[in-house]
Design a protein with these regions (language model features):
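Extended, noncatalytic alpha-helical scaffold/tether regions
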Residues: 1-244
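Extended alpha-helical rod/solenoid/coiled-coil scaffold segments used as assembly/tethering elements
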Residues: 210-398
Length: 398
């Protein structure tokens, strides 16, 4: 009412003084209201916040009255407190982000992951606070959760854009894809405390589609090469052990090799890492890794065949053959149980075929040595059901 009276007649000096006083009071009130709004993101000031929001609503109501009243002559209206609320929300978010700890590590990969982790933590913490302590004080049309979320999201966009201006190594590429596909959308936006409060459809994707495709292609190529390198190193070490001619290690009184364990751990590790990014990328990577297992099996067979040809009189030939046949069984068990998807059937068949051929190489040498002293004159049917059954029994006895 005082404001209305001041602006009814502005000709005399008294009214000018009154207007100054009124505007001065409004400025004090405005500063107090938006100080509360700004601090509310990190403080428990619900009573003050309730009063501040009510003050904004009152000003919006008075703005609308002045707009609808053609007789109203108030140049101070509209006061635009609602617009200032939006800018204050952004300012409060910006201030919160300035409080993030500075990275002190010299490791670029650690720096990238830590910077995103810090952003994610403050996003989840602050949005949870907004849901639990601020949202109920605002009318629905303020859309308070999405308003705050948009500004945090802009910070993510800016940070991601800055990061991708530089060439990323394999670890950074992996982490960035994990963040874009999994951590941010699932662990943060879909966190139970935030579920239903943030409209994800209104949040722009953190990376352009083409950049995502490029990073995914780089990641897949790198992962395939990494797994290929490690499984072949394992095979090379195993082949060196054969040629040295030492007795294989025993586990529970049985000859034992770690080859299948090392190889399958590397294969599963590649699949597991892809799952940390997305199921879609896993489905893309898994057939490529399966193809590398097939190539591994071919090389395994070739090296084993070469070993048998060069070491026919080696002291521990039999135990080495036995551990490799057992190793093949473990590989075949794995592909039988895990390569059941349609896209893996061809690799499953190829893998089993190669492994069976490798086993037969071992069976042949074992049978030749076994029956040599018996002076068997007629040609043996090495691959008959009877012989296979006999070989299985012999192998299980070691």
């Amino acid at each position: 009412m005082l404001e209305q009276e001041c602006y009814i007649n502005t000709d005399d000096e008294l009214h000018h003084d009154n207007i100054k006083q009124v505007e001065s009071l409004y400025k004090v009130l405005e500063d107090m209201v938006f100080a509360v709004i700004k601090d509310s993101i990190k403080m428990d000031c619900e009573n003050l916040l309730d009063q501040a929001v009510q003050a904004i609503l009152e000003q919006e109501k008075e703005n609308n009255r002045c707009i609808s009243d053609i007789k109203a002559n108030n140049p101070a209206r509209p006061r635009k407190w609602k617009q200032k609320w939006i800018s204050t929300v952004k300012e409060s978010v910006d201030d919160r982000l300035k409080e993030l700890p500075k990275d002190e590590t010299n490791n670029s990969s650690s720096s990238l992951s830590q910077s995103f982790t810090n952003l994610g933590k403050i996003f989840k913490k602050d949005l949870t606070h907004i849901v639990n302590h601020l949202k109920q004080h605002y009318p629905d049309d303020f859309d308070v959760c999405n308003s705050y979320a948009q500004h945090y999201h802009q910070a993510f966009l800016a940070h991601t854009s800055t990061i991708t201006e530089f060439e990323l190594g394999d670890k950074d590429t992996f982490f960035l894809l994990c963040w874009v596909h999994n951590i941010y959308p699932n662990d943060i936006l879909k966190d139970p405390s935030l579920a239903g409060h943030i409209d994800e459809a209104r949040l722009k994707c953190l990376l352009p589609a083409q950049k995502i495709r490029d990073y995914e292609s780089n990641y897949v190529s790198s992962e395939v090469l990494t797994v290929k390198s490690w499984i072949n190193k394992s095979l090379d070490l195993e082949a060196q052990f054969w040629n040295v001619g030492k007795e294989p290690e025993k586990l529970d009184e049985a000859y034992h090799t770690e080859l299948h364990i090392d190889v399958l751990q590397n294969f599963n590790g590649g699949v597991r890492r892809a799952m940390e990014i997305s199921e879609r990328l896993t489905n893309r990577l898994k057939p490529l890794l399966a193809a590398e297992l097939v190539e591994f099996a071919k090389r395994y067979k070739s090296l084993f065949e070469e070993y048998l040809e060069k070491n026919k009189n080696q002291q521990y030939l039999w135990p080495i053959i036995i551990v490799n046949v057992n190793c093949c069984w473990n590989f075949r068990d794995f592909v039988t149980q895990n390569f059941n998807d349609a896209q893996l059937q061809r690799h499953k068949e190829n893998m089993n075929s190669i492994l069976l051929e490798l086993e037969d190489l071992g069976y042949t040498v074992l049978l030749q040595n076994l029956f040599q002293d018996l002076k068997v004159t007629k040609k043996l049917a090495f691959y008959s059901i009877h012989i296979d059954s006999l070989m299985d029994q012999l192998l299980h006895s070691f």
